[in-house]
Amino acid sequence: MKNKFLIIDTSILPDVFDKVVKVKELLRTGHVKDISEGVKQVGISRSTYYKYRDSVFTLSESVAGHKITLGLTLAHKAGTLSKILDNIAQKKGNILTINQDIPINNAANVSITFDASQLEVEVNELMEDIRTLKSVIKVNLAAVE
């Protein structure tokens, strides 16, 4: 059976999945010395950890070497797209394609696809950085390939 992957907001999932990810992060960063210490710290059993550890990943874990497509709505202001592209490039995202509609009612829809294999931050953090830029109306994760 072929695996099927979904991107799901953790707020709708049982806490156990978030706790498995937390244990993996504690192990990766060296904040705990072994799995027993990690599961004890977050409050799950070892069997729960082993059951889900190979199936639950953060978005940043799952996109290494993958393409990300962001859908954006931008105000029609000079330099807005350039600032977004600079932001992605500064975090080592490699732009692959840009599609931009003509502005209607002073707003344009843009999709940007980039290689995330060298991305230095999590995709969520990159999206938040872009959201804070002036003239950015909306940012959403359109696709992960």
Swiss-Prot record:
Entries under InterPro entries matching the protein? ACT-like_dom_sf, ACT_dom, UPF0735_ACT_dom-cont
Which intervals hold domain ACT?
69-144
Family designation: Belongs to the UPF0735 family.
The protein's name is UPF0735 ACT domain-containing protein CKL_0858
